[in-house]
Design a protein with these regions (language model features):
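Short, Lys/Arg-enriched N-terminal segments with co-localized hydrophobic residues
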Residues: 18-38
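Hydrophobic, aromatic-enriched alpha-helical segments typical of multi-pass transmembrane helices
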Residues: 34-270
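Serine/threonine-rich, low-complexity intrinsically disordered segments
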Residues: 7-9, 20
């Protein structure tokens, strides 16, 4: 046994002398040593980064268009006025709901696109961010069923039915609460996923540090605002004002990725 222990270093040295083994080990050590410092951006990453910018802008446009008619423009309107508008413009109302649904689907597409861009930085964190954002897309799209039911109640208010106006108003309020709860949960998942993606952008220096850092902060704000809106649904409209910085950060990120693209990471000193 002592003889084997004394000769083992020589056996190891002879193993490295085998043709091909030394070169293979050298390449492996060089690869491991440069990992984290060599953040070479591939053409695929650049393509997907610009695609991410397009998807972000498309998501914002789809969401604003859908909500502008069904929510924003209906602010301050009575139940009867909203029901009359929905009944008289049924096709427009449903088209706006479709637009909102497509905006939730775009969140899932964006999750995969950002995963392709940031997976080389840290695969585990990128996978977690992907799961969170895909969950947000699923929950948000599922919550749309409440708004579809709400639209049907608006249509029913203009025809003879078994429900009185007060009963329909109560049912609409219930569907609004259900939709709002689903959206706030989706926001929490979105914010958590976005925070991880921006963290990877910060680590890789693919985005300016200020923009990536601000993205982490606004994503955390989105999670907090969503949690508060879930607990205090009557304060949702006031809490939404705190989401303006998150919207501006999204727009800035989209424009940067679309027109500037990814910036390679500066090589480590020493």
């Amino acid at each position: 046994m002592a003889c084997l222990i004394r000769t083992s270093p020589q056996l190891v040295a002879s193993a490295f002398a085998i043709p091909g083994v030394e070169a293979m080990v050298g390449r492996r050590l060089q690869s491991n040593g440069s990992r984290g410092n060599d953040m070479t951006i591939t053409p695929e990453q650049r393509t997907y980064a610009r695609l991410a910018g397009i998807v972000i802008l498309a998501h914002i446009v789809l969401e604003l268009f859908g909500d502008s008619v069904t929510i924003i423009a209906r602010g301050g309107k009575s139940f009867a006025e909203t029901a009359r508008f929905a009944a008289e413009n049924e096709a427009l109302w449903r088209f706006c709901l479709l637009s909102v649904g497509l905006s939730w689907i775009s969140i899932g597409i964006l999750a995969y696109v950002l995963y392709v861009v940031l997976e080389p930085v840290n695969k585990r964190l990128a996978q977690l961010a992907l799961v969170l954002r895909l969950s947000a897309s699923s929950v948000g799209a599922a919550s749309l069923m409440f708004r579809v039911a709400q639209a049907r109640l608006y249509m029913a208010s203009e025809t003879e039915s078994l429900f009185t106006s007060e009963q329909l108003r109560a049912l609409v309020a219930v569907t609004q609460r259900g939709s709002g709860a689903g959206v706030t949960i989706a926001w929490m998942l979105m914010g958590a996923g976005y925070a991880l993606f921006f963290l990877l952008f910060l680590r890789s220096r693919y985005l300016p540090r200020a923009l990536a850092g601000f993205g982490i902060v606004t994503s955390a704000i989105l999670v907090v605002v969503a949690a508060l809106a879930f607990v205090f649904p009557q304060r949702t409209n006031e809490l939404k004002l705190f989401l303006v910085p998150a919207l501006l950060t999204e727009i800035a990120t989209a424009l940067w990725l679309l027109f500037k693209g990814l910036h390679p990471r500066a090589p480590a000193e020493g």
